[in-house]
């Protein structure tokens, strides 16, 4: 797969930032106040599916993408940086008759890939551009085809939104298209919606994600029969292992980001210390030369007199033994 050309992507980022914000980015003028409220983008993604009879059905998938307090939400589900694949309930509009959309609207379960990428605009500043792209993979278990991607650009500083906009580009030219689907992060954790409670009108067939508890019971309204409780499937060991590895990777990155500056500071001190000591020793040798080393013990010259060994028994040890025997006999 080929991704978007780097030149066109850089040009879009430059135009997005430079046109409305060139004054306060370059001259230091007062920045525009953040937008009031969290930006909400209800985008419609055009997709096509294949019917059972072989005909092509055109549909629109409606996704509500919001940004609030440094977090991106897709249909109230939090999405982190990278490519995340989520399955959620959303509004789907059939496009056979665009003049009467109410009769063609229905809720379905879609599987969608969401790309969230953060571009730092300036070094040492909290100003950054958040790019969001989406690709619909399935609708109610059926594969879909998508030609265009709606890209959302949000310019933020200190978690405050300065401006946001969106535009459409071909799927083949998007960053999301160049990233393999094998590296997608599967959104499987339950109860991560920013909304604490679900509307009482929601039935078991309308839950966004499955709960890991034994059953999920619905609130029975007057005049409405309860549905069969939905029994959830426990998370598989593979998903748990993936979550552990992802947590380990984040902890390792955090540890290395903390140790890396300390290591280089220590290395800098060592290099500066050794270099400085060598320079100081060289200067001392130049200005204070030393002819001899005081640390070495030197001895005075002494005349050596040769000593000649005198043999007291010139006849040898055998003669000495005979003399001793003679003396004994006497």
From Swiss-Prot:
User: Which residue stretches are annotated as topological domain Cytoplasmic?
Assistant: 290-330
Q: How does it sit in the membrane?
A: Single-pass type I membrane protein
Q: Which residues form the signal peptide?
A: 1-23
TM annotation in the entry? 269-289
- The residue ranges for the Extracellular side of the membrane come to 24-268
Does the record bear Membrane in its keywords? yes
Q: What GO CC annotations are associated with the protein? A: membrane
Glycosylation positions?
46, 64, 166, 191
Principal localization reads membrane
Coiled coil where? none
Keywords attached to this Swiss-Prot or TrEMBL record, sorted alphabetically, are: Glycoprotein, Membrane, Signal, Transmembrane, Transmembrane helix
Q: What is the protein name given in its UniProt record?
A: Glycoprotein integral membrane protein 1
Native organism is Homo sapiens (Human)
